[in-house]
């Protein structure tokens, strides 16, 4: 097969591993910088160009779209879909999962466990909002934040009110969530491919830190999932419409709670923590599922 990997940097660990795995299985691979692409949108022969050259025909595309370029990246992916290229994850599913508030609302509708979450527009609603999530301590998150950036643990009600009002004053969209103390600064990343959780790791925050992101110095170890945790991860990925996803779960006294569903999960942490060749499993999944007509939405919506 001819496979395109949408990535800003061919030297990134995940991009490099996916390319190596695809080549090892006999496929032709091209890394495409989606920000350097531009599109010819017409009714007879839509195409994608890069640096003055029309891209060749691909059988499948693996989107590795960073959060900061979601709009343009998914536009390029939609163009691939309209041209009949099979996407590992569809543009609609990626867009859905990148909207943190919408994704929580969709998960809630499917009765999937979540931390109690509040969202408001006016500073006058802040006191009631804090009551909704059980008061302080609570977690305040920028909707546009990634890798733990824009996430604040407010340990007192006064601190929470000050942080929320400051964010609102900057016209930033935020949500407020209950703090799950019993998680102990740890979460579980479940790596979902198709209808299976193929790997899982526990990420532990540094002492004095509550954010367990590996980008923030957290450590990762292999972990055994309970049947309920496995089921929750699969249901969360399916609700987003994602074939490949990193589902982040907190262990709480109420059972597993989904924090986030990541449409472009990194491979380095999970492969090194578990020893599992995740990249190879992704390529195998593509081999089994590629059909020119298998994009459900055809780039619509």
UniProtKB/Swiss-Prot annotation:
Binding positions (ATP): 141, 178-179, 187, 211-213
Name the positions where Mg(2+) 1 binds: 248, 260
InterPro entries, A to Z: ATP-grasp (IPR011761), ATP-grasp_RimK-type (IPR013651), ATP_grasp_subdomain_1 (IPR013815), RimK (IPR023533), Rimk_N (IPR041107), Rp_bS6_RimK/Lys_biosynth_LsyX (IPR004666)
Binding sites annotated in the UniProt record for Mn(2+) 1: 248, 260
How the cofactor binds, per note? Binds 2 magnesium or manganese ions per subunit.
Domain spans labelled ATP-grasp: 104-287
At the top level, the lineage of the source is Bacteria
Could you give a single Gene Ontology term from the biological process aspect? protein modification process
Per the record, the similarity remark reads: Belongs to the RimK family.
* NCBIfam families registered for this protein in UniProt: PRK10446.1, rimK_fam
EC number(s) from the headed UniProt entry: 6.3.2.-
**What's this protein's name?**
Probable alpha-L-glutamate ligase 2
Q: Which gene encodes it?
A: rimK2
Binding positions for Mn(2+) 2 per the UniProt entry: 260, 262
Give the molecular function GO annotations: ATP binding; metal ion binding; ribosomal S6-glutamic acid ligase activity
What cofactor does its activity depend on? Mg(2+); Mn(2+)
